[in-house]
Amino acid sequence: MFNKTPEQQQAIRNTIKLKMEGRETLTMSDIKTICPAVSTPSPSPELRKKLGITDRYVHVPTTQVIEDIQKLGWNPIEACQVNARKRKGYQRHMIKFVNPDFIVEGRDEYPELLLSNSHDGTTSFTLDVGIFRLICSNGMVIKTQDFGSMKVRHYGYDFEAIKSAVTELMQSIPGYLKQVEEMKQQKLEKDQMLDFARKAAMLRFAKTNEESIEKIVDLSDFLESTRKEDDGDGLWEVFNRIQEKVVNGKFQYAFGKKERKARPVKGFKQQVKLNQDLWELASSYVPEAVVAG
């Protein structure tokens, strides 16, 4: 990239962006171009001191983990990193993977793996499971009591460590897909839909309460469908309508008399957390007897 003109560099980035929008497999060169933090070299002693990285921290480039996950059948399709000044090159970043074996013809949903990491000594490698929905090109991240994120430490990292984490998550995927089917079967009453919308809005506006939130957002607007596939009173449809608006900012809100258009949640860490909390909220509307089955 460094021997390219600015115009050529932008053209390369645009091509990679189109690949990500089409959910095509990214090359390592693609990933390094849009997410340079994946290949940052081990910090020098001086930089370790400046960033507060302890001597116990063992540097494992994310590129190595990406290659290891690919060996397990998962292809990288998206990459991003947070903006940073002080920790530039060592900041948090995320890679998203899909496995062709889990893409079933005729099914609208399939799982994703989300790998997040940083090279500043503040985080372990973290793997989350997501569900991608073809209808709206929207992704959600799962959070349940039974299965959580998998963390792999830098210290003592080897292929078997990531293989074990990925294998354990893969074993949980059928259970997640079963939860999706249970949500599709669960119908909600009008008051339950409003309750869902209210609690979801409070996740987006964390400093609100049940009394104040309805002065900020129109809950009925949260429940409006933007596509026919999301029509209906099923929990899955209601969840998808609300999730898309809360995460992508497709709603109006007001503090006082001034009305504003909500913006999408930008940071991937915030996106993952909000998606996980929304999934947990949706799961609470499935009767325990159904979940246990």
Feature annotation, model-predicted:
Residues 1-91, 195, 201, 292:
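N-terminal low-complexity, intrinsically disordered segments
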Residues 1-23, 101-293:
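Intrinsically disordered, low-complexity regions enriched in serine/threonine
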Residues 79, 95-97, 115:
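Generic structural hydrophobic/aromatic packing signal, biased to beta-strands
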Residues 86-102:
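Charged, often glycine-rich, active-site loop that binds/positions anionic groups
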